[in-house]
């Protein structure tokens, strides 16, 4: 399991995904925290380098697009594919990581 929660800019999180997501074992997770930034009012991130359109969720969307369009290999040599696991979001009801629970399939 890999948990990403540092700088929240799109480029930084995308780079983290490229580096660390390939380490995730099949059936395990890459969790990207604070994807909810995309859904916040601009005023909540006014003093930050991230905000709507430039955040962890947009990086997740871009990374999944790259996986689909370009493909990637995992560290174990298998194809790297992730699905959103909404069962976690539904169980906990409130989360800072909508679209951020990525299960390797």
Q: Positions of the model-derived regions?
A:
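C-terminal substrate-binding/active-site "lid" region of AdoMet-derived donor-dependent transferases
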Residues: 10-105
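The substrate-binding groove and active-site-proximal loops of carbohydrate-active enzymes
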Residues: 7
